[in-house]
């Protein structure tokens, strides 16, 4: 039985909801951190974590399944070449949701969704002066 396996409706039609989640998955895979509302973040976690688990085993069938769900070649390449090997030893829990307070316009709860082991792109530069 599949009782209780549905996603939140998020006040959208099914086509709009699936397209929105697909776009959010692609953005998260590309940028490794995105800002969205808390209910969308919780739904995004439910769809992106199985994709990363799929990418841990790089077979042609898994690539085709990932492309069927993502519909973006660059995201599939990054998923299988970068994220799959990075999370190979981790048994799940690839994303982190951080609450960010409330949005100014409509007071919606906001959240930051990020991949757990993401490489810090902007490292703090050290101000060491060489004495010449």
Swiss-Prot record:
A Gene Ontology BP annotation from the UniProt entry: translation
Entry-linked SUPFAM superfamilies: Prokaryotic ribosomal protein L17
Transmembrane segments annotated in the record for this chain: none
InterPro entries: Ribosomal_bL17, Ribosomal_bL17_CS, Ribosomal_bL17_sf
GO cellular component: cytosolic large ribosomal subunit
GO MF: structural constituent of ribosome
UniProt entry keywords in alphabetical sequence: Ribonucleoprotein, Ribosomal protein
Gene3D superfamilies linked: Ribosomal protein L17
Coiled coil spans: none
Source taxon at top rank: Bacteria
Record bears the keyword Ribonucleoprotein: yes
Subunit and interaction comment: Part of the 50S ribosomal subunit. Contacts protein L32.
NCBIfam families the UniProt entry points to: L17
Protein name: Large ribosomal subunit protein bL17
Gene name linked to the record: rplQ
């Amino acid at each position: 039985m599949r009782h209780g396996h549905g996603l939140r409706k998020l006040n959208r039609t099914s086509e709009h909801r699936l397209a929105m989640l697909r776009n959010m998955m692609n953005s998260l895979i590309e940028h490794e951190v995105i800002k969205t509302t808390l209910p969308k973040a919780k739904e995004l976690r439910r769809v992106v974590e199985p994709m990363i688990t799929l990418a841990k085993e790089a077979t042609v069938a898994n690539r085709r399944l990932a492309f069927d769900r993502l519909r973006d070649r660059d995201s599939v390449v990054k998923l299988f070449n970068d994220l799959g090997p990075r999370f190979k030893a981790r048994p799940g829990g690839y994303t982190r949701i951080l609450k960010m307070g409330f949005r100014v316009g409509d007071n919606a709860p906001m959240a930051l969704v990020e991949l757990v082991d993401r490489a810090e792109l902007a490292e703090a530069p050290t101000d060491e002066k060489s004495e010449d």
